[in-house]
Amino acid sequence: MIRSSFVRSLPAVLTAFVIASCSGAGGVDSTGPLGQSPDATATAGSGLELNALWWKDWHRDVVTVSKTIDATGGTISIPETGLTMTFPQGAVAAPITITVTSDAEYVAYKMAPAGTKFLKDVIVTQSLSTTEVAGETLKRQLSAAYIADDTVSLSGKVPVSEIEPSYTTFSAGSSPLPLAHTWIIRHFSRYMLASG
């Protein structure tokens, strides 16, 4: 009986150990969402330029999803790109139709209505299985970046306005691979996943 209990809990213990060991010195924080801390704030990106991540399959179809979110909260997902947005209860005071459009080449999204501000943090999770880093070890830390100008090209170095509080989730094992990147947003318009 004790042995079967130990065997059942072993995967959870090993996962916790791997996560703890990955959060030490090095690039990526995989410990938990910074958005859960009241002190977590976006970092001003003034003068900062980053490279947008590419989709794994070039020239991916642009996907647009719309959904009405009300004061009870809700979720918007784009399965084709691996995006999930979770709106907690109280994020908006009144019903609002949210539209999210993926970029054809880069791991980036336009979110509307532009200028929308949220009363509570919205949690965004991007599966990395659809991106250029799928199945690869990370060479550089990933960042979720806000781009104030919806018309700026995402090719090359992209000027960003904010770096959002975020973390990367990794697989367990001797060579952890990135699985997803999660960040918080407090307002809309355009966001991308990027590296330095």
Residues covered by each model-derived region:
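Bacterial N-terminal signal peptides that target proteins for export
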Residues: 2-11
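C-terminal motif of bacterial Sec signal peptides marking the signal peptidase cleavage site
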Residues: 18-21
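Proteolytic cleavage junctions
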Residues: 23-84, 90-98, 114-119, 132-196
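Short edge beta-strand/loop segments characteristic of extracellular beta-sandwich folds
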Residues: 86, 125-129
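A mature extracytoplasmic/lumenal domain signature
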Residues: 91, 104, 128-130
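Short beta-strand elements of extracellular/lumenal beta-sandwich folds
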Residues: 104-112
